[in-house]
């Protein structure tokens, strides 16, 4: 069965990370959907991580798996103190610890210098253009962000917010209840 047709699968989230003018913003919508029903409209899927809150993170996918990814990543961040190193160390653990298995989630993480996608299979990906878009409406948000970056002077926070709003108008699993954090 196609996962989008399974009434027991949680569909949730569009997350976008945008860089402009020395700033980075991570935004996410607030909708959580179970099957064909909206279960919650104001979930907070974007957070600050690390001792000083200098890493932004947003998640897409199964909530329990996403929170597991958050916890594991934050532990590595606390231990190593640097975004890329923490992500690589988490990926190494993935390859060696069977208990981690395959988590059905993605994290978008960013600090002042770097943006990364961390997958539930242990992959770490740095986008070439500094834009990350994950989740059900990710393609729509990515398209909107690229257009706004290319053709406006809007700041990173505004672009991220508008990208989520545009995705929310198109994707049935995304709403316009935006939470955004910026560095």
Swiss-Prot record:
It is an enzyme of class 3 (hydrolase). It catalyses: ATP-dependent cleavage of peptide bonds with broad specificity. The keyword Protease applies. GO terms for biological process: proteolysis involved in protein catabolic process. The keyword Cytoplasm applies. GO terms for cellular component: cytoplasm; HslUV protease complex; proteasome core complex. Keywords: Allosteric enzyme, Cytoplasm, Hydrolase, Metal-binding, Protease, Sodium, Threonine protease. Gene3D superfamilies: Glutamine Phosphoribosylpyrophosphate, subunit 1, domain 1 (3.60.20.10). One of its GO terms (molecular function) is metal ion binding. Signal peptide: none annotated. It is found in: Cytoplasm. Pfam families: Proteasome. Na(+) binds at residues 168, 171, 174. Its EC number is 3.4.25.2. Its main location: cytoplasm. The active site is at 13. Allosterically activated by HslU binding. A double ring-shaped homohexamer of HslV is capped on each side by a ring-shaped HslU homohexamer. The assembly of the HslU/HslV complex is dependent on binding of ATP. PANTHER family: ATP-DEPENDENT PROTEASE SUBUNIT HSLV, METALLOPROTEASE TLDD. Belongs to the peptidase T1B family. HslV subfamily. Protease subunit of a proteasome-like degradation complex believed to be a general protein degrading machinery. This is ATP-dependent protease subunit HslV. The lineage of its organism: Bacteria, Pseudomonadati, Pseudomonadota, Gammaproteobacteria, Lysobacterales. The gene is hslV.
């Amino acid at each position: 069965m196609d996962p989008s047709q399974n009434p027991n699968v949680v569909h949730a989230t569009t997350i976008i990370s945008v860089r402009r003018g020395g700033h980075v913003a991570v935004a996410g919508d607030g909708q959580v959907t179970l099957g064909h029903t909206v279960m919650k409209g104001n979930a907070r899927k974007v957070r600050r991580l690390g001792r000083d809150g200098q890493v932004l993170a947003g998640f897409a996918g199964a909530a329990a798996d996403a929170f597991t990814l958050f916890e594991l990543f934050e532990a590595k961040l606390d231990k190593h103190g640097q975004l890329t190193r923490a992500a690589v160390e988490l990926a190494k653990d993935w390859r060696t610890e069977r208990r981690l298995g395959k988590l059905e989630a993605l994290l978008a993480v960013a600090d002042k210098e770097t943006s990364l996608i961390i997958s539930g299979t242990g992959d770490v990906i740095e986008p070439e253009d500094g834009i990350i878009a994950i989740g059900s409406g990710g393609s729509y948000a990515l398209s909107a962000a690229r257009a706004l970056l290319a053709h406006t002077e809007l700041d990173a926070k505004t672009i991220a917010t508008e990208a989520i709003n545009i995705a929310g108008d198109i994707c049935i699993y995304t709403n316009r209840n935006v939470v955004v954090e910026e560095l």
